[in-house]
From Swiss-Prot:
This is Dihydropyrimidine dehydrogenase [NADP(+)]. Involved in pyrimidine base degradation. Catalyzes the reduction of uracil and thymine. [4Fe-4S] cluster 3 binds at C941, C944, C947, C951. GO terms for cellular component: cytoplasm; cytosol. NADP(+) binds at residues 339-342, 363-364, 370, 436-438, 479-484. Keywords: 4Fe-4S, Cytoplasm, FAD, Flavoprotein, FMN, Iron, Iron-sulfur, Metal-binding, NADP, Nucleotide-binding, Oxidoreductase, Repeat. It comes from Dictyostelium discoideum (Social amoeba). It holds the Pfam family Fer4_20. Belongs to the dihydropyrimidine dehydrogenase family. Homodimer. Binds 4 [4Fe-4S] clusters. Contains approximately 16 iron atoms per subunit.
Length: 1009
């Protein structure tokens, strides 16, 4: 082969390197007039579609909507606070920090389960909740520069992923079976109106076990205002169908075309038919119309929001109705009256119906608008105009059509009240008027009898129980009682369900004790999966246990961990009284492996903490108490002493007498104890390990495990010594010896005492996981079927599965508890169950864990070569707007299908152990004739050039970077090293695909024989 000629160090790729960063050796300038023009070439922020460009465009426009990348980034930012204020701000009391914690570990089912447990319309609320005035309102991160968490976006993301899984809801089988419930659970229950509040109420009643629950809906579609009045670009009908399907999974029935006041259908008629409890969730069905608009019709150019928004929804929400409705054609100038959320839905919908200009007019000032910022910001971005301090005076018509609107000016007094100045009025030209001045019960009030209404026109109820003050069997919620947001309506239904339950049981002589409500959680077949595992005769209810570390500092802490669901615990290492220790402080510090990252989710910790300061007698007593109170949990005693047969024998016998299930020999503490001839001092020598294991084997019949140090050349040799000495298994690994960092004055942290001295400590956490995975797999390959307890960065179900695949049976956990609290185990449990369940469904086998496969999208060839910035983005928008004019808005993209049954048995945890081992081996066994190259998805690329830079300065100069479009192009020089993919900030933007040509390495110079 012929290599380079001339100097081999000469730079040859001048063209490719043209845009590669170089060090500036002097300041530069560009005239302002030039830079002003240039910046437009790269603009992204102000180039979204707006105004008339939005005609027929009902795609999601919410700025809160997240991709998986965004969700993982945002969830990692969450502090997961104690007594979290976000939960207090949520009407449904969602455990927000828990579901966000699950998202951060890629356990999207766990997140969805948490959400749907408290909010059966969790996806709807994730999409439309005014979080800025609810959960986000109290976010502690609002006190920082980066601002509050995007809670709504995270909720939407997790529940949408669960929707794609297509898994049915079932009733928790741990509850009393339906066949064994008393007759009171067969009571007939009616709900009127199939909107959010009724769906919520019916779902909880179904979970409680009521089997005769019927919803009566006036329309031929379901969902109430979620379907008819919230636009598709905020909430599509697929979401409504999905949540109703989950409700129907519990046996709830729905009857269509049942309109109050028609054909004798009333609240009282239902009671006469034997319905023992009735829930009214009909909203406020009629608009409030200003007398100025009396006798005006849509043909003349006037709409109420109650008329306009349903017309838009029927024409734009695929699957909502079978009719072939057309969008209202508002070709001209539109005035929207009102300043609530509904008014802004009307305003942004008007653009999609062809409006050339939309003006939102309202009586108050900007600071007193009722609409939430989420709605106002979208309208502002889409170029709606705003006209505050005005009140309708009269409509101007010409030839029977609206042509203008006259307004009075209003003023705000010092007392905060608004007044009308009739001396000031003006005219605004328009072609259409949409009134969004609120709604009222109207003519159906009589059909709601015996329900009565208060002076505000809302139902007269007890707001603590949602019970009518005039009929104990009648309950109400949602708009009807003045709670106008979707999430408040959902919570009304939830509250009513419990009180309906209490009422019905009392009717049948079964009083429900006072105390906190106990509504059943969301439950699916995933939750039935068995994740128990047996190792060395010990039956672990789940593979998650506390490592012998800070979370096991005391018996009371282990007790609390068991109460939260942990399967086992290893005690903090204890010694004989003659070897008692006293710790220094400070002794546990955050890692530096994740850069300057503060707060949650630390990638590593370093500690110089010694073994337990408590006596061996304390721990032996504690073990007995824990086994007495938690007989199904595994308790393993961790012991340590020097190389002394009598001491090891005594400690082993004490541990056995305490009632422990097993013993762990701490032969690996990397700091402090080694200086005393213990821990690391014993565990680095195969001969010492062999003899210690022999002594312990002779002293006890309990299974015992040697805890191994990674601070050796080859850990499998230490494992072999333990095996040969009689140990039943090993724990791999203990912490890695390290020095975490130095300050600018050369002092390390932790620095002890006035002299600021330090020592090498043990590094733990995710930073050690690659070392731990290597250790576990190496031991497994060397000692097939030898029991292994893994530890070292097991911070999720996802990480746990990796350890199982490498040969471990259970995992010990410390750092993730230090990062959060004991409740994280529930995230790991649901995550592991989900992983196993998904392997039983053929349609889910292509998922990467809980990450859905990339959707196959037919890419528009017209968009090729057009990045999403500057003039190229404007051109993309033009093409998209043009093609939207002919789009079939009623074509269902993702039709709802029945949940498939498993096609294979759900595998056991044991089936996962060792799965990766056959594919881990020698470098010489790797195929050199099966090469790959990088493929960049232009549509996903954000044009950052990270791939280009790393390939230039750390790779093979194989990527070109267009100076105008910033689109990267992989050339034939690509060697498939994968570095570009590793630094790419967008998941799946770069993939490695088979190389189509034979790979010929560049040897630099001609190969010499």
């Amino acid at each position: 082969m012929t290599g380079h000629t001339g100097d081999v160090s000469q730079v040859h790729d001048i063209e490719i390197l043209a845009l590669n960063p170089t060090v500036n050796k002097h300041a530069t300038f560009k005239p302002t007039i030039v830079s002003k023009k240039d910046k437009e070439n790269w603009a992204r922020l102000d180039h979204c579609k707006k105004g008339c460009e939005l005609k027929n465009d009902f795609e999601d426009v919410k700025p809160t909507t997240l991709t998986e990348r965004g969700a993982l980034f945002e969830s990692a930012r969450c502090l997961k606070c104690a007594d979290a204020p976000c939960q207090k701000g949520c009407p449904t009391q969602l455990d927000i920090k828990s579901f966000i914690s699950s998202i951060s570990t890629k356990n999207y089912y766990g997140a969805a389960k948490t959400i749907f447990s408290d909010n059966p319309l969790g996806l709807t609320c994730g999409m439309v909740c005014p979080v800025s005035s609810l959960c986000q309102y109290g976010c502690n991160l609002a006190a920082t520069e980066e601002g509050p968490i995007n809670i709504g976006g995270l909720q939407q993301f997790a529940t949408e992923v669960f929707k794609k899984m297509n898994i049915p809801q079932i009733r928790d089988p741990s509850l009393t079976p339906l066949s064994q419930l008393p007759e009171s659970y067969k009571a007939k229950i009616a709900l009127i109106g199939c909107g959010p509040t009724s769906i919520s109420c019916a779902t909880f009643l179904g979970r409680l076990g009521y089997t005769d629950v019927t919803i009566f809906e006036k329309e031929q579609y379901l969902g109430g205002l979620s379907s008819s009045e919230i636009p598709n670009y905020r909430l599509n009908y697929e979401v409504v169908e999905f949540e109703i399907k989950l409700m129907k999974d519990l046996g709830v029935k729905v009857e269509y075309g049942k309109r109050l006041g028609e054909n004798g259908f009333t609240v009282e008629s239902l009671q006469k038919q034997g319905y023992e409890a009735i829930y009214l969730g009909i909203g406020m069905p009629e608009p409030k119309i200003d007398p100025v608009f009396n006798e005006l019709t849509s043909d003349q150019g006037f709409f109420s929001s109650k008329e306009f928004l349903p017309k838009v929804s029927k024409a734009s929400k695929a699957g909502m109705c079978g009719c072939k409705s057309q969008l209202p054609q508002l070709n001209g100038r539109v005035i929207v009256l009102g300043a609530g959320d509904t008014a802004f839905d009307c305003a942004t919908s008007a653009f999609r119906c062809g409006a050339s200009r939309v003006t939102v007019c309202f009586r108050r000032g900007f600071s007193d608008m009722r609409a939430v910022p989420e709605e106002v910001d979208i309208a502002k971005d889409e170029r709606c105009e705003f006209l505050p301090y005005v009140l309708p005076k009269q409509v101007i018509k010409r030839d029977g059509k609206v042509v203008a609107m006259e307004f009075y000016k209003t003023e705000k007094g010092d007392d905060g009240n608004y007044s009308v100045d009739e001396d000031q009025f003006f005219r605004v030209k328009c072609d259409y008027i949409i009134s969004a001045f609120g709604s009222q019960i109207g003519s159906v009030a009589e059909s709601c009898s015996p329900l009565q209404f208060n002076k505000w026109g809302t139902a007269d109820i007890d707001p603590m129980t949602m019970t009518s003050k005039h009929a104990e069997w009648l309950f109400c919620g949602g708009d009807l009682v003045g709670n106008g947001t979707t999430v408040e309506a959902v919570n009304d239904g939830k509250t009513a369900s419990w009180n309906i339950h209490k009422y019905l049981q009392s009717l049948h002589g079964i009083p429900i004790p006072d105390g906190p409500p106990q509504l059943p959680n969301f439950f699916t077949p995933i939750d039935l999966v068995d994740i128990s595992v047996e190792m060395c005769g010990m039956k672990f209810p789940n593979p998650f246990g506390l490592a012998s570390a800070t979370p096991a500092t005391s018996a009371a802490m282990i007790r609390r961990s068991f109460e939260q669901g942990w399967g086992f615990a290893v005690t903090k290492t204890f010694s004989l009284d003659k070897d008692l220790v006293t710790n220094v402080s400070p002794r546990i510090v955050r890692g530096t492996t994740s850069g300057h990252h503060f707060g949650p989710g630390q990638g590593a910790f370093l500690n110089i903490e010694l073994i337990s300061e408590k006596t061996c007698h304390y721990w032996c007593k504690a073990i007995g108490e824990l086994k007495r109170d938690f007989p199904d949990r595994i308790v393993i005693a961790s012991i340590m002493c020097g190389f002394n047969k009598e001491d090891w024998t005594q400690l082993a016998k004490m541990a056995e007498a305490s009632g422990a299930d097993g013993i762990e020999l701490n032969l690996s503490c990397p700091h402090g104890m080694g200086e005393k001839g213990m821990g690391l001092a014993c565990g680095q020598d195969t001969e010492l390990v062999f003899h210690i294991c022999q002594w312990v084997r002779a002293a006890t019949r309990l299974p015992f495990f040697a805890k191994l140090t990674p601070n050796v050349t080859e850990i499998k040799e230490i494992a072999k010594a333990a095996h040969d000495g009689g140990a039943d298994g090993v724990t791999a690994i203990n912490t890695v010896s390290g020095l975490m960092g130095l300050k600018g004055d050369s002092n390390a942290w932790p620095a002890i005492g006035d002299e600021k001295r330090t020592t090498y400590g043990g590094v733990s956490g995710n930073a050690t996981r690659p070392i731990a995975l290597r250790a576990v797999s190496s031991i497994r390959k060397s000692l097939p079927d030898y029991p292994i307890m893994a530890t070292g960065g097991a911070d999720s179900a996802d990480a746990t599965i990796q350890f199982l695949h490498c040969g471990a049976s259970v995992v010990q956990i410390c750092s993730s508890v230090q990062n959060q609290d004991f409740t994280v185990v529930q995230d790991y449990i649901t995550g592991l169950k989900t992983y196993l369940y998904m392997q039983s469904r053929e349609d889910l086998l292509q998922w990467d864990g809980q990450s859905p496969p990339n959707e196959i999208i037919n890419k528009n060839p017209k968009l090729k070569g057009l990045p999403k910035f500057g003039k190229y983005l404007l051109e993309r928008n033009r093409i998209d707007t043009e093609e939207k004019q002919n789009i079939d808005l009623q074509k269902v993209k993702n039709p709802l299908v029945p949940s498939p049954n498993p096609t294979h048995p759900v595998p056991s945890l044991k089936d996962q152990i060792n799965r990766a081992i056959p594919r881990i081996g020698r470098h010489d066994d790797l195929k050199r004739d099966q090469q790959v190259v990088a493929l960049i998805d232009e549509d996903k690329c954000i044009n950052c050039g990270k791939c280009y830079m790393t390939c230039n300065d750390s790779g093979y100069q194989a990527i070109k970077f267009d100076g105008k479009t910033h689109i990267p192009l992989v050339t034939d020089l690509c060697t498939g090293c994968d570095l570009c993919l590793s630094v790419c900030p967008v998941p799946d933007c770069i993939t490695m695909v088979p190389r189509e040509t034979i790979y010929v390495p560049d040897r630099g110079l001609t190969v010499q024989n």
